[in-house]
Amino acid sequence: MNIADYKGGVWVFAEQXDG
């Protein structure tokens, strides 16, 4: 499951729920 979160103007892709 690939989740893309927009943080600080940067797309952060979390595939393993890291962070």
From Swiss-Prot:
Subunit-structure text: Heterodimer of an alpha and a beta subunit.
Source organism of this protein record: Clostridium pasteurianum
Highest taxon in the source lineage: Bacteria
Cofactor requirement: FAD
Entry's cofactor comment: Binds 1 FAD per dimer.
Protein name, as recorded: Electron transfer flavoprotein subunit alpha
Keyword annotations: Electron transport, FAD, Flavoprotein, Transport
Entry's family note: Belongs to the ETF alpha-subunit/FixB family.
